[in-house]
Amino acid sequence: MARTHKLEDVRNIGIAAHIDAGKTTTTERILFYTGVEHKIGEVHDGAATMDWMEQEQERGITITSAATTCEWLGKQINIIDTPGHVDFTIEVERSMRVLDGAVSVFCAVGGVQPQSETVWRQRNRYGVPSLVFVNKMDRTGADFLEVERQIRDRLKGNPLVIQLPIGAEENFEGVVDLVKMKEIVWDADAEMGSAYHEQDIRPELQEQAEAFREKLIEGISEVDGNEELMEKYMEGEELTTEEIMAGIKAATIHMHVVPMLPGTAFKNKGVQTLLDAVVHYLPSPVEAPPIKGTKMEDEDVEVVVESTDDGEFASLAFKIMTDPFVGQLTFIRVYRGSLESGSYVLNSTKEKKERVGRIMKMHAIKREEISEIYAGEIGAVVGLKNTTTGDTLCSDKDKVVLERMDFPDPVISVAVEPKTKADQEKMGIALSKLAAEDPSFRVNTDEESGQTIISGMGELHLEILVDRMKREFKVEAEVGAPQVAYRETIRKAVNKEYKYAKQSGGRGQYGHVFLKIEPQEPGFGYEFVDAVKGGVVPKEFIQPVNKGVQEAMARGIQAGYPVEDVKVTLYDGSYHDVDSSEMAFKLAGSMGFRDGCREANPVILEPMMKVEVEVPEEFMGDVIGDVAKRRGQVSGMDDRAGNKIVNAFVPLSEMFGYSTDLRSMTQGRATYAMEFDHYEEVPQNVAKEIIEKRNS
C-alpha cells in the first residue's frame, strides 16, 4: 500500500487546552468539516466521538488522547486529542512528545486559566510550534484582545493576531483576515456553518484592521531569517500575500510567534479558517526539528533521526490502550522509514524483538486496517508484548534509542481491597494492565499490612483508575483512606536487665540477659553486638536473643510501627543447665528490648515530603500561610517564568487533599510537585493522637 500523502503534506498536531475551553467540540467540528464525521457529537450530551471512554463522557472531560486522521486542502492532518485536567498532565506530556505542532484552545471569556499555564510550559519545554484558537466568541463576556493581553502577560508568550473578530457575543459573525485584508463571514442560513464567503472590510473596521496588519508585518519581519521582509517593509513596499504567509510560517516554526485566531466551534464559525492556518503555518515532519536519540549499544553516541521515508525504521511508542475488541493497542509515531504488518521490529529500549500483528489507523473510535505505515504518520499496532510508553521501536539494522520521556513520581497512595475472592485474581491482572498503560500509576504490596497499594498523580487520577477497574475489568474493590508509613525510635541510651523464668512442674524456662540499647543516626538501621565474657550466656543462645530483639522491633514500642536506628549490645546474663532454651532467650531478648525502649524516650517518626509549589505572586502569601498550617517549614523561594517558587518540607500526613485545597486557594493557577525526603520526629501532641488511634 503506497503513501496516500507526501511527507511534506502531513501535519501532526495536538489540540491542548484548559478543561472546558471547548477543545473536544473544536476537534469534533474539525472532523465534521474534513468530512469524516456525519453527526456532530456534543460534549454537553456526552456523545463526542473523541471522548471514547465511558468515564470521559460522564465527567465531560477528555482523559485519553485518542488519535485521529483527517484531510484538509489535500493535506493529511493527524490529531492527538489531549486531556485538560491537571491530574492527567502525563497524557499531555506524552502527546507533546510526538507532535510537530499544536493548537492551544482558549476560552474567549475565561482567557488564560491554570491548566493553560501548565500546558504552555510543556509546549515550551518540548519546543512545539503552536497556533492559538480563541473559542467561544459567541459567549457573553467574550473578549479576544483581553485573551491576547493575558497570553502576553501571564504566559510570557508572543501572540500574533492574524485574524480579528467581527462582532462578539451574539453578534459574532465572522473574522477579518489580516493577511488577505478581507472579511470572512459565515452565512447565517447555511446549515452547520458549512458556507462562508469573502467580502471587503466594512468601513468601521478598516482602521483597526490596518493597525493590526501593521503589527503583524512588524512581528514577522523582526524574526531572524526574515530580513528581506524587513527591508521591503522599511522601504514602504507592499508585501505579497505569499510573502506574508511564508513569514508567519517561519516565525511560527522557530517559536518566535504564536498566530492567533478567533471563532466559536459550538456555533460553527471559524473552524475552517483554523484548519487553513494549521495547513499554512504549522510544520510538516520535514520542517519540524529532527528528533535526537542515542545508539543502543553506546548511549554516549548521539544520533539525529531525520524524518524521511528511506532509511531504517525508527518510531516511538507514546501510548498504550486496551481495546475491548483487539486487545492491547500500542500507538506509535513513525519518524523514519516504514513498517509493514506481520514484520519483526526491535524494541531498543528493552533490547527485545517484537512481532507486529495488525496496524490500524484510528479515527477516534472507528478504525481502518492498513498494511503499512510510513514516516511522519501516527498509527496503532496490535500484537506487541513487551512495549510500554516511551519505548523506541526500530529496525535491527540501525539500533537507536529515541530520547525517553520524563515521567513524574506518584504523589498519593491508597489501599485497595478486592471485595470477593474472585475479584482478587482479576484485580491483579487489571492493575498490571492499567500500570502498563500509564507510567505515572504504580502498584505495590505493603509488606507490613499485606495490602495492595496504588499510587498516582492525584485523587482524581486514582478515582478514575479504580472506576476503570470496575467497568473494563469488572473488579469490585474497596478503597481505603490514604495511608502514611510511620516509624519509631529512641532518644537516649539505657541498660536493661531482663530475666525470663517459668517454673510449672517438670522442665522450666530460664533466660537472663543484660542489654545496652543506644539510639543511632537516622538511616543507621540496626546493629547487634555480642559482648558476653566468660560464657555466662552460651554461644547457642546468643542468636536467639538477637532474633527476639528484631521481632520486638518489628512490633514497635508505642504505636506498633517498626523501630529503626538502634544498636543493641548483649553484655551479660546467666543460664540454667536444664531449664534454659533458645525459646527462653528469644523471649528474654524481645521483652528486655521492649521494656528497655519504653524507658529510652521513645518517639514516633513521620515521612517528610519535599514540596515545590509554583504560584503566581499574588497568591504566594496564602500558600506560605497554608504550609505553616500543615506543620511545614519553608526552605527557600525562587522565581520562574513570572511565577514564584515556594520550596518547603511538609509531613505527608498533612498533604492529603492538597491538590484540591491548592486549586481553590489559587483559583487553580498554582501547580505543585512533591517527593519523599526524610523521616522526622513527630511533635508530642500529634504523637499522642497517633498512639491513641493505633491502640483504640
From Swiss-Prot:
Official protein name in the record:
Elongation factor G
Gene responsible for this protein: fusA
Q: Transmembrane segments in this chain: where?
A: none
User: What lineage does the source organism belong to?
Assistant: Bacteria, Pseudomonadati, Campylobacterota, Epsilonproteobacteria, Campylobacterales
Q: Which domain of life is it from?
A: Bacteria
Q: What is its main location?
A: cytoplasm
Q: What does this protein do?
A: Catalyzes the GTP-dependent ribosomal translocation step during translation elongation. During this step, the ribosome changes from the pre-translocational (PRE) to the post-translocational (POST) state as the newly formed A-site-bound peptidyl-tRNA and P-site-bound deacylated tRNA move to the P and E sites, respectively. Catalyzes the coordinated movement of the two tRNA molecules, the mRNA and conformational changes in the ribosome.
**Which HAMAP family does the UniProt record give?**
EF_G_EF_2_B (MF_00054_B)
The record's subcellular locations are: Cytoplasm
Cellular component GO terms, alphabetical: cytoplasm
Extract the SMART domains matched here: EFG_C (SM00838), EFG_IV (SM00889)
* Protein's UniProt keywords contain NAD: no
Which keywords has UniProt assigned to this entry?
A: Cytoplasm, Elongation factor, GTP-binding, Nucleotide-binding, Protein biosynthesis
Q: Which family does the similarity line name?
A: Belongs to the TRAFAC class translation factor GTPase superfamily. Classic translation factor GTPase family. EF-G/EF-2 subfamily.
> What GO molecular-function term can you cite, just one?
GTPase activity
